[in-house]
């Protein structure tokens, strides 16, 4: 290691897709080898970091002693972690989905409250103190914080440290209110509505209602109590952030680009759009040669609804119906389906799958996997994927956009509805469950996650994007638009640009 080099300290959670922007940036920082790298996160991230370091050593052909490394600090060491983890352990991923718009606004407000009041005051302040002690000990030139760890934002700001936010998603929700003329009410779809852009006039009343409902949590007693505890602890008197905390004068590094987002004229200097910040991944030829052999058989639709999605039997049935509609119309197409079933309905889900797609599975036209060995980016860039069906997660959206592959979004929660809006606005795919999602009504007092997929609607979206035949002009135009946008993304810099910004901030060579 070089003496007296500046260091950067990352604070991040370890969720698989969410943390990819951090891993991608660290990969490039390791290749540059100009700064020392520390990361505070949870234990599941450590093996991925170790693999990343080994990949860089292999690529640079440096010896173990001379290779740069990453210093890992276990975020679970803060004293309040055990209590916090115990409170969160019973949450089921399959119960997260909610409708868009008016019918889901109450649920969005509740989930936003949980994001703001992410911990009880005692735990929040415990993480604040722990991260402050670590920062004082390491004295990094730069602190990098992910959007969710609000105590670490507070720490960096209160200690007066130079810090930046590395986002896995667009910061549009933080920028839209800056566009003027109250356009967040009448022009831009409110968070989690899935409304088209520009907003249709008839949707304005519901849009305003959803926008205001999502803000109500800021006055909730839990948030008020946490704010009081923060201020009493000496934390600078700024209100809690949001899903996309936007702070004046704090660099915001994002995987977005103007070309892949909703149009906004007022973008501050401290927002650095890098384009998709994707992890370095081995080609599919080495990571899963068996899958590559199967992909080479026919044009393939990739169905993968994200790390956190677990499908109840009813959802499995409706997805299977949509896939069957495509296969019946397009005998030249096959489907790779990453399917993770919800545990209590796994048997009935399997029965639904076999009754609807049993023959196609036997014939090898449908391949189901609970996990994909190859990285999604490697699969998307194999040249064999004609459509990516995903849940609208930011990571999935940016991966498919970068790869130049048409998309269908089966939106499930939070901002996934917003990425469905982007896909349709940009002409690179379809919102595959708009009507079903809009028709769902839930009981807030006895909440049961609804099925948000209708097989017929999903099948129609597949035919629209993949085409009813090889010469379908509508599908050809969608593919053309996706390919053009992919070329823009791949020229944008992505993880290289993100690492350049981090390095520039460490050395004080970047204006913002």
From Swiss-Prot:
GO biological process, one term: antibiotic biosynthetic process
The keyword Glycoprotein appears for this protein: yes
Membrane in keyword set: no
Glycosylation sites: 207
Activity over temperature: Optimum temperature is 30 degrees Celsius.
Highest taxon, organism lineage: Eukaryota
Protein name, per record: Glycosyltransferase sdnJ
Family under the similarity heading: Belongs to the UDP-glycosyltransferase family.
The gene coding this protein: sdnJ
InterPro entries: EryCIII-like_C (IPR010610), UDP-glycosyltransferase (IPR050271)
Molecular function via GO: hexosyltransferase activity; UDP-glycosyltransferase activity
Group of enzyme by EC: transferase
EC number of this enzyme: 2.4.1.353
Pathway: Antibiotic biosynthesis
Annotated disulfide bonds: none
Keywords: Antibiotic biosynthesis, Glycoprotein, Glycosyltransferase, Signal, Transferase
Protein task: Glycosyltransferase; part of the gene cluster that mediates the biosynthesis of sordarin and hypoxysordarin, glycoside antibiotics with a unique tetracyclic diterpene aglycone structure. First, the geranylgeranyl diphosphate synthase sdnC constructs GGDP from farnesyl diphosphate and isopentenyl diphosphate. The diterpene cyclase sdnA then catalyzes the cyclization of GGDP to afford cycloaraneosene.
One Pfam family linked to the record: EryCIII-like_C
SUPFAM superfamilies, alphabetized: UDP-Glycosyltransferase/glycogen phosphorylase
Signal peptide: 1-24
Comment on pH dependence: Optimum pH is 7.5.
């Amino acid at each position: 290691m070089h003496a007296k080099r500046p260091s950067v300290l990352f604070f991040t959670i370890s969720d698989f897709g969410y943390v990819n922007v951090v891993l991608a940036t660290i990969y490039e920082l390791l290749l540059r080898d100009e700064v020392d790298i520390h990361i505070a996160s949870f234990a599941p991230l450590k093996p991925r970091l170790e693999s990343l370091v080994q990949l860089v050593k292999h690529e640079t052909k440096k010896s173990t002693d001379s290779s740069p490394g990453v210093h890992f600090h276990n975020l679970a060491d803060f004293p309040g972690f055990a209590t916090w983890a115990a409170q969160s352990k019973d949450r089921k991923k399959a119960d997260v989905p909610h409708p868009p718009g008016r019918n889901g606004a109450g649920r969005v407000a509740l989930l936003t409250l949980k994001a703001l009041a992410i911990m009880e005051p005692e735990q929040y302040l415990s993480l604040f103190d722990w991260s402050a002690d670590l920062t004082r000990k390491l004295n990094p030139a730069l602190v990098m914080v992910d959007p969710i760890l609000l105590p670490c934002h507070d720490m960096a700001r209160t200690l007066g440290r130079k810090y930046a936010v590395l986002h896995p998603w667009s910061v549009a929700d933080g920028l839209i209110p800056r566009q003027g003329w109250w356009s967040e009410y009448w022009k831009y779809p409110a968070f989690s509505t899935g409304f088209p852009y520009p907003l249709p006039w008839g949707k304005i009343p519901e849009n305003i209602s959803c926008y205001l409902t999502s803000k109500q949590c800021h006055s909730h007693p839990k948030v008020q109590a946490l704010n009081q505890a923060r201020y009493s602890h000496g934390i600078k008197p700024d209100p809690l952030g949001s899903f996309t905390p936007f702070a004046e004068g704090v660099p915001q590094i994002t995987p977005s680009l103007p070309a892949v987002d909703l149009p906004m004229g007022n973008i501050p200097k401290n927002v650095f759009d890098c384009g998709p910040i994707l992890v370095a991944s081995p080609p599919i030829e080495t990571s899963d040669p068996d899958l590559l052999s199967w992909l080479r058989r026919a044009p393939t639709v990739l169905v993968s609804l994200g790390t956190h999605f677990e499908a109840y039997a009813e959802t499995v049935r409706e997805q299977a119906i949509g896939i069957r509609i495509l296969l019946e119309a397009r005998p030249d197409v096959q489907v790779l389906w990453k399917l993770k079933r919800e545990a209590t309905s796994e048997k009935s889900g399997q029965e639904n799958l076999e009754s609807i797609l049993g023959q196609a599975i036997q014939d090898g036209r449908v391949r189901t996997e609970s996990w994909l060995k190859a990285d999604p980016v490697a699969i998307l860039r194999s040249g064999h994927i004609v459509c990516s069906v995903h849940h609208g997660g930011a990571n999935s959206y940016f991966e498919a956009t970068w790869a130049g592959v048409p998309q269908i979004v089966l939106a499930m929660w939070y901002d996934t509805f917003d990425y469905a809006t982007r896909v349709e606005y940009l002409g690179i795919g379809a919102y595959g469950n708009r009507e079903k999602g809009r028709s769902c009504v839930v009981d807030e007092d006895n909440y049961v996650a609804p099925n948000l997929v209708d097989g017929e609607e999903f099948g129609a979206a597949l035919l629209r994007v993949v085409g009813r035949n090889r010469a379908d002009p509508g599908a050809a135009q969608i593919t053309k638009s996706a390919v053009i946008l992919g070329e823009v993304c791949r020229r944008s810099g992505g993880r290289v640009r993100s690492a350049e910004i981090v390095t520039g901030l460490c050395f004080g060579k970047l204006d913002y």
